[in-house]
Amino acid sequence: MVIRILKLARSAARLILAAALVVGACRASLAQGDADLEAPGLEPFAAPVSSGTTLFQNVRIFDGQSATLSAPANVLIKDGIIARISANPIAIDANAKIRTVAADGRVLMPGLIDAHWHAIMASTPQMVLMTADPNYLQLVAARQAQATLMRGFTTVRDLGGPVFGLKRAIDEGVTIGPRIYPSGAFISQTSGHGDFRFSFEVPRVPGGQLSHSEAEGIAAIADSPDEVRLRAREQLRQGASQIKLMAGGGVASPYNPIESTQFTEPEIRAAVEAADNWGTYVTVHAYTPRAIRQALAAGVKCIEHGQLIDEPTAKLLADNGIWWSLQPLLDDEDAPPLANPVSQQKALEVFAGTDNAYKLAKKYNVKTAFGTDILFDARLTTRQGAILAKLVRWYTPAETLKMATGDNGALMALSGFINPYPGKLGVVEEGAIADLLLVDGNPLENIKLIADPDKNLLVIMKGGTIYKDIATK
């Protein structure tokens, strides 16, 4: 018996030692920050064309702020930053390894920014999203991230979904894609727009198993200020750059009227306080004046959608310097696929309000961001640039492109000291991050050039690294 006990003790000791080694290895891996990409079989599946120093010669610049193009100029990119812009030739060291792009007078502009994106949900049908293996969904999202970058969108603000791993993989060069400002799981009340539970997952049992959508990190359900605060802090712990709450009814969710106001002011304020302590902000999904006004009273700094807004509430947004992240949602070829008749009817209500919303945003000079909010359809993702081009129904091409570059860049900076990409985005100026597009043609005259990125985007650069170059012979 004693011998047996000694053997068991030795086995236990070996297990403890092995566990310690595993924990140590995990900590070492986390400390290093990325995988060993030099190891066989771990090369990035899509390598960039070139990185390092790049010189763009003879470009006309749309800087993300002005309404006109610059005179012919030269732009030097070094260490991922726009190092110099000059009307005169920029001297370079003959021995230096510099990639030169002869632009021949083409337009250099900032990379596009989509302020309302869902990397996990954009190209996956809703029922697949709710039932498929999470690993499959991540692989689909990685493929879509590459396509997003190749459409010229160098940054996205992700407003719901488990994208922390995808963001890390992109940042570390494991795969390619845009910069991601992640929200993590969107926070919803029970029966709210983010409550996608199946009928067998209701009622909620205190301390019970999470629903499928919660376990995947798509949604987080909370029903008190304390629960909202907890869920917000969980997203911040994982690396959220802003917090997303569902403050009103939605289209794709079957269990709530679109006119409903969701959460209470104290519940929303709990998330605002948690975000503010982290130096960042809360944005909310809301369509109606009542939902928007309650969110503003709680300290929210950004409204998503808002198509059912009224004029006094639009003026309130302007008077308080609130961001309005608005999407050109219309009853056209870009309408999302919705099988549920209830959702279809709610979508028509939203579509009917879009024109008025943009007119009010422009009338009161509200700080307006551009986003697509593409959901559940791979075909629609290919039209990301075409959806941006629709804004010329209300804005000039210059105003449209400014919204999707310089203005959206200012919104990204609202994440304060937890900004995952410190520096200036969305502009072409010395010292800014070198996220750039070289366009074959003038998008200030023909914005539809953006809708055909394969043909018209000759160079796509993110952080000084070129991912596409069909301009250099």
Regions found by a protein language model. Give the residues of each.
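Bacterial N-terminal signal peptides that target proteins for export
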Residues: 2-16
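Bacterial N-terminal signal peptides
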Residues: 12-27
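Boundary at the C-terminal end of the N-terminal hydrophobic targeting segment
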Residues: 28-33
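Histidine/acidic-residue-rich, glycine-tolerant segments that coordinate divalent metal ions
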Residues: 162, 171-294
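Active-site core of metal-dependent hydrolases
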Residues: 183, 190, 246-356, 367-369, ...
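His/Asp/Glu-enriched, well-ordered alpha-helical/loop segment
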Residues: 277, 352-443
